[in-house]
Amino acid sequence: MDTKLAVHEDAPPLVSWVPEEGEKLEQEGEDQAKDRGQWTNKMEFVLSVAGEIIGLSNVWRFPYLCYKNGGGAFFVPYFIFFFSCGIPVFFLEVALGQYTSQGSVTAWKKICPLFQGIGLASVVIESYLNVYYIIILAWALFYLFSSFTSELPWTTCTNSWNTEYCQHALNHSGAGIGSSTENFTSPVMEFWERRVLGITAGIHDLGALRWELALCLLLAWIVCYFCIWKGVKYTGKVVYFTATFPYLMLVILLIRGVTLPGAYQGIVYYLKPDLLRLKDPQVWMDAGTQIFFSFAICQGCLTALGSYNKYHNNCYRDSIALCFLNSATSFVAGFVVFSVLGFMSQEQGVPISEVAESGPGLAFIAFPKAVTMMPLSQLWSCLFFIMLIFLGLDSQFVCMECLVTASVDMFPRQLRKSGRRELLILAIAVLCYLIGLLLVTEGGMYIFQLFDYYACSGICLLFLSVFEVVSISWVYGADRFYDNIQDMIGYRPWPLVKISWLFLTPGLCLATFLFSLSKYSPLRYNNVYVYPAWGYCVGWFLAFSSMACVPLCIVIALLKAQGSFTKRLRQLITPDPSLPQPTQQLRLDSGPGQDRRPSPAKEGLVTVEKETHL
């Protein structure tokens, strides 16, 4: 179509835009986005990320760390890491995905081929998470089904799995719910270890398969499969329920918790500041690792979820809002947890230090014990485990979606064909389920602890975070990435973010990583069982299998490249030319919020800037 523009001789000068290769690449990018799929609206993205990052660690890890590390004083190192590491790295990963429209592996390959190993390392961590994280859902489902009885089975000592050492009330000092005296154990502990786990003497004896847990695990995988099998447009609808329902449960449990006798004392223990604890480096390490755990940083999930955003989505504002939402949820969850623990402390007549637990001990020992002391105990048990299931469910299927995204983006020709995605998801689910059966054997808890302590540890995440921020801020260029972000959102983010990328984040992460190594202590199950030497070797193999991806990929890339070392290095730090390039401003003082990218699909072959201020 021939377009003629009649312009008055006194009118402002016209600037014609001749379509070049960059516009063709942009059009190809739009077509690729259609092939990959995009979020229907911003809320789907926000809820999907919220579902991923707001999980079990918000409920069972943060409150205990806060109590253990000086109460309110713990917020000092927590918020230092929050602003200097949490928000900057979180935003970096989301912006990287949105800018490249690629999953974790191919995003790093396009922006800085030398550091493609960062993406591969995140895929390794995602794979481990897909195997072991869902085991928690199987346990929670087992407890939920066990709650539909006239009397909760962990209330009494008259069940077939109880031993002669079971004692219904351990009120005396030194016999809390998670501990045992020389001769006695509690019914809730025996239900957990003998009925649910059937735990053996050690990792050398895996024992038989716990078929009830295997069925619960199968149910969890079936639900996860159907939550993501049709792509992000379908997943975006699922998270409207799975990401919001836990908040309803949290509010109900909060109201119930703060109305219990003894709740005030528990909350005081949770928040009472002990500033002397800030002298302990362990407090700072716990704050840093908690930020990386709860924000799902360096796991590839944020990059994958961001890749389904529209190019001009304001990912900066979204990232800040999601980070604050995550921390606020952790803070509120602390009131739920410690109001109940305060109630337990008063009912049993023991110090709160003897009932305070973290991790599985809180979810499957402390809380089940607490609900037995409440009226309508079956109701509160059901509500609590439903909340746990939904907190874990969306974290699990979103993590699964991110692994699928990375795989499809690596092999688009093979896996983007009709029906291939569903088969890929099915294959991954079946494989992870079969491997997961090892974790629901009678000795499976020992394997679970290895995964949790080594495979997805803070050491791995801190290691990868250093390479992430260094590759973007120092190799690709912080100013260049800021230009890309400005092209996407229309303005440049707060300068502190760039300063953090350049100095604060790599410095703090490296210091915390080195301190974590220096303070390393071998895993002990229940602080008692010592693993055999080969067990620790397996654990460190799980840890190094992800971290080793970065240096190995650097070496392999340098060996495969052609030319001198300098030429090879230059090739490997050069971004892919197909990436969107910031457009040149055709005005002198026009607003920063305007979209400066020409769209040949919408404007035709000639784009005319009718108004200038020249």
Curated annotation (Swiss-Prot):
One of its GO terms (molecular function) is gamma-aminobutyric acid:sodium:chloride symporter activity. Keywords: Cell membrane, Disulfide bond, Glycoprotein, Membrane, Neurotransmitter transport, Symport, Transmembrane, Transmembrane helix, Transport. Residues 574-614 are annotated as: Disordered. It is a multi-pass membrane protein. Belongs to the sodium:neurotransmitter symporter (SNF) (TC 2.A.22) family. SLC6A12 subfamily. Its main location: membrane. This is Sodium- and chloride-dependent betaine transporter. Pfam families: SNF. The chain crosses the membrane at residues 45-65, 73-92, 117-137, 211-229, 238-255, 291-308, 320-341, 374-393, 423-441, 458-478, 499-518, 538-556. The keyword Transmembrane helix applies. PANTHER family: SODIUM- AND CHLORIDE-DEPENDENT BETAINE TRANSPORTER, SODIUM/CHLORIDE DEPENDENT TRANSPORTER. Glycans are attached at N171, N183. Interacts with LIN7C. It comes from Oryctolagus cuniculus (Rabbit). Residues 138-210 are extracellular. It catalyses: 4-aminobutanoate(out) + chloride(out) + 3 Na(+)(out) = 4-aminobutanoate(in) + chloride(in) + 3 Na(+)(in); glycine betaine(out) + 2 chloride(out) + 3 Na(+)(out) = glycine betaine(in) + 2 chloride(in) + 3 Na(+)(in). One of its GO terms (biological process) is gamma-aminobutyric acid transport. Residues 1-44, 557-614 are cytoplasmic. The keyword Transmembrane helix applies. Disulfide bonds join C157-C166. GO terms for cellular component: basolateral plasma membrane; cell projection; plasma membrane. Transporter that mediates cellular uptake of betaine and GABA in a sodium- and chloride-dependent process. May have a role in regulation of GABAergic transmission in the brain through the reuptake of GABA into presynaptic terminals, as well as in osmotic regulation. Probably also involved in renal and hepatic osmotic regulation. It is found in: Basolateral cell membrane; Cell membrane.
